[in-house]
Amino acid sequence: MSVIPQETDEALSPEAIEAARKIFAGPIAFLKSAPSLKFLPDMEAPEVAFAGRSNVGKSSLLNALTGRNSLARTSNTPGRTQELNFFDVGEDPVLFRLVDMPGYGFAKAPKDVVLRWRFLINDFLRGRTVLKRTLVLVDARHGIKDVDRDVMKMLDEAAVSYRIVLTKADKIKPTELEQTLAATIAEARTRPAAYPDVIAISSDTGQGIAELRALVIEAVS
């Protein structure tokens, strides 16, 4: 778990962005999948987790951040990722880990699958002392939904700091994006564990990717 967020002015300096680029250009490898807590890797390195509704673009974002085309599998099937997937960044030593959390909000999932997801995520958030930040991905075309609020409530209650990231920012008009950003920032500022700033990104165009890399590095530093 992590402390309540505080802003760092230097996080998005040109120097920080370049340093983050170099780290993400280095060795990155899939470590393991964990369908339950007993399969979690040892807590040997700080972690940043990625959460979001099914098909919000988590896998595409992970690939864009790391500059790989197939680090994380992308799928047109909502809810495909039903495990916690861990990726090592750096080697000898591992600098930190990225955690791809199971997508949520899949409408046709059986109730037992939904309950299993909730127990897995809740226990992971509350017991993972090396988890430094969670990035909650929200589709810019739709804004924050109730299922997102459920996850943010879990993060608030677990005292895990998180930042909201608007994905697919290139899919809507700039004026619509501004409105969605304003509404999202306003809601983030009502949440005890959320950063008050929101970043909009596009995995397709690269918008915001360099800045998000720097924010990830800030979280684990």
Where does each model-flagged region fall?
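Canonical P-loop GTPase G-domain recognition
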Residues: 25-37, 171-221
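Residue-level signal for inorganic ion chemistry
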Residues: 87, 167, 212
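Extended low-complexity acidic/polar segments
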Residues: 43, 156-163, 213-221
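Conserved C-terminal guanine-recognition region of P-loop GTPase G domains, centered on the G4
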Residues: 93, 119-196
